[in-house]
């Protein structure tokens, strides 16, 4: 059995997907990171196998029937605007500088339902 955690990024913005994937691969090297440009792409895969779902605010709103039961595994990619403060769903401010973004990801890890044995802070370029 494969114990390697899998993480899904569901976001239509290619640069956001690639940037987040790169950061996650640095801080969670033991994880498999998959990107999807739409909710339908995720549904065509095996949607319940993921340890975490990083999703755009729009996808969360449009498909909250899927993500609400998985809110402990769901992280919404948005700004820190009060309108994005969702009940019980972590929000990652994607407009922060890289160093703060990485620190926010590490803080989210502390409250994650899945444990990663060793996360490291990458060198900020």
Give, region by region, the residue ranges found by the protein language model.
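N-terminal regulatory/sensing modules of transcriptional regulators
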Residues: 1-113
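Conserved small/polar residues in nucleotide/adenosyl-binding loops
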Residues: 117-123
């Amino acid at each position: 059995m494969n114990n390697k955690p899998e993480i899904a990024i569901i976001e239509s913005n290619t640069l956001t997907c690639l940037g987040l994937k790169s950061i996650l691969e640095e801080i969670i090297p033991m994880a498999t990171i998959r990107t999807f440009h739409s909710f339908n792409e995720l549904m065509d895969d095996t949607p319940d196998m993921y340890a975490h779902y990083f999703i755009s605010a729009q996808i969360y709103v449009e498909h909250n029937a899927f993500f609400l039961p998985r809110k402990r595994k769901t992280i919404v990619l948005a700004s820190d605007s009060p309108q994005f403060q969702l009940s019980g769903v972590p929000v990652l401010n994607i407009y922060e500088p890289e160093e703060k973004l990485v620190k926010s990801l590490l803080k989210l890890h502390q409250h994650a339902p899945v444990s990663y044995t060793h996360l490291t802070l990458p060198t900020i370029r």
